[in-house]
Regions:
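Short metal-coordination and nucleic-acid-contact micro-motifs, chiefly zinc-binding Cys/His arrays
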Residues: 4, 55, 197-201, 212, ...
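A short macromolecule-binding patch
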Residues: 79, 383-400
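Histidine-centered nuclease catalytic patch
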Residues: 205-238, 242-249
Length: 424
């Protein structure tokens, strides 16, 4: 069941309604106005005789890539959403850093190098931009729900991971637990290089040579996202090492990848959310899994959030889910710089920007790209390009003049989808 969310005259959230006829009459009689189209929210322009709100519980399934959020009241799902987070922040900042360094090399070639002069790096409790985005996305979704619904309680599914134990499961034994956390892979060695050579028995791992000059080689290069982890390092002789870089030797060794970034991010997200919402109730993943199995429900982020908010009790499903995706706020490279009396570009072509929500032949899309010739490339909320090859001639590539803009670009794209949840 789809709901219309209601805000009182003084800005306080009220219980949502499914009486669309009454909402239509209020809008026609100028007793209410539209605040938001997705999700559809109205604000009353008069004081009702009585304001009664019920208890609404907000449940959130925290995550490093996706967030599931649900609000449950009177054993009914009043709101449910699934947010896809950004994963391009680090790569974009790496590109910025590379361009900045190359620019300074060109512009100030003979100037003494400067480094460690960033004020932001000296801030107390500073978070990396990629982690800060994920924490802020969780907070934004909670605050959004509190604006449209009278949330009285917050339940968070959070987790805390022991990354040392994930890398070395033997730390679970009491006999080595008290000292194992202080002794890593290269403990007792002067450098990681010596530890790698000792692990590989001072022998080339391709040809088996010994008693020769040995090199420690990155299996996945640092330029391709490789790390200095011991699983990514291998011992090679000088001939095999130069042969790999010359393309004459192929390294077939597979590394055991243990990606600990999501686990680290989840631990940080937990601590930050509990600092912002100290009254929130914590729950764990195995509790949600048990409740899902008891209710015979499939695994999904928004269904997990519904189970978290309901506390494992039965509830009435909502057939509307709000799919959201976080995107950059703007294309800043197009709008910055000293320009004198030149007009500052705003990144618009015929009043359209990238990520604008538009309507084309009755369906809603987002702008993926624009052409100065007046055409556009459209996509869905999951960044999939829409193919219009089935359209008649003249409409296979959408024209900007045929598009109707629904909403301007925002940092969070949103679209409503009708679903039929499978409870088999």
């Amino acid at each position: 069941m789809m709901f219309v969310y209601v805000i009182s005259k003084d800005g306080q959230p009220l219980m949502p309604t499914s009486r669309f006829g009454k909402v239509r009459r209020l809008l026609n009689e100028n007793k209410a106005k539209v605040l938001k189209r997705c999700p559809f929210t109205i604000k009353l322009l008069y004081e009702p005789k009585s304001l009664v709100v019920q208890e609404v519980v907000l449940g959130q399934d925290t995550g490093s890539k996706h967030i599931g959020t649900s609000c449950v009241g009177n054993d009914r799902v009043l709101y449910q959403s699934q947010v896809e987070l950004r994963d391009d922040i680090k790569s974009k900042m790496d590109g910025r850093r590379q361009a900045r360094r190359f620019r300074r090399y060109r512009k100030t070639r003979y100037r003494k190098p400067r480094f460690l002069n960033r004020k932001n790096s000296t801030k107390l409790d500073r978070l990396p931009p990629s982690v800060r985005h994920k924490v802020q996305a969780h907070i934004d979704e909670i605050e959004f729900c509190k604006k449209i619904l009278p949330v009285s309680k917050i339940v968070l599914e959070v987790s805390q991971f022991d990354t040392h134990l994930m890398k070395n499961p033997s730390l679970i034994f009491e006999t080595i637990k008290h000292w194992g956390y202080q002794k890593g892979f290269d403990y007792g060695w002067a450098s990681k290089r010596e530890a790698i050579l000792n692990r590989d028995r001072y022998m080339c791992q391709i040809c088996g040579k010994k008693h020769t000059r040995l090199e420690v080689h990155h299996i996945i290069y640092r330029s391709n996202g490789g790390t200095d982890d011991e699983n990514n390092l291998i011992t090679l002789c000088e001939d095999c090492h130069s042969g790999i870089h010359n393309g004459k030797v192929v390294l077939f060794k597979k590394i055991k990848r243990l990606n600990l970034k999501p686990a680290t991010h989840m631990s940080i997200i937990r601590s930050q959310l509990l600092n912002v919402y100290p009254d929130a109730i914590e729950t764990l993943g195995f509790v949600t899994k048990t409740n899902l199995e008891n209710l015979c429900l499939p695994k999904s982020h928004y269904i997990d959030a519904c189970v978290i908010a309901s506390g494992g009790k039965t509830f009435e499903f909502n057939d509307t889910i709000y799919q959201k995706r976080r995107v950059p706020k703007g294309d800043y490279q197009l709008t910055k710089g000293v320009r004198g009396e030149q007009k500052i570009p705003i990144g618009k072509i015929q009043d359209f920007r990238k990520f604008d929500k538009v309507k084309y032949f009755g369906k809603e899309y987002f702008i993926k790209g624009r052409m100065s010739s007046g055409f556009a490339i459209l996509m869905d909320i999951f960044n999939n390009k829409i193919d219009f090859s089935y359209m008649p001639k003249g409409y296979k590539t959408p024209k900007l003049s045929n598009l109707e803009r629904i909403s301007a670009r925002r940092s969070c794209l949103c679209i409503s989808q009708r679903i039929i949840p499978s409870i088999a």
